[in-house]
Amino acid sequence: AIYAGTGQDGSNDVDVAALTYAVGPVTVGYQYTEIDREAAAAAGAADSERRQASIAFAINDNLSVSYGIIDTKLDGAANAVDEEITGMSIGYSMGGMTLNAHHNEGENMGGNALNEVEHTEISLSFAF
């Protein structure tokens, strides 16, 4: 599937193009987003270009895994470095129970070379 859109978010111009492709148990996706901030130069904010890619694999009816990356280039901000985010997840379901886990890491968040984040979450849910 191919998706595209353009519009405004307040005074920001936003353009998006994305595609997904599924074959058998594998799905891959790619998205490109560009944000042109009208007041970027005056406020010290940055325009941005974001590229996202992912792959998901359904190992069987109950177990699936996925991996994704996001690279964001910040244009115009003083001393800004590119953001890099990676994440992976796994999900297992059996009857009414679902166990999910994911781990994400971000480097240079907000264009700051000293800003790194990490998040891990495990959840268990039951449907009655």
Predicted regions and their residues:
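Outer-membrane beta-barrel proteins
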Residues: 1-128
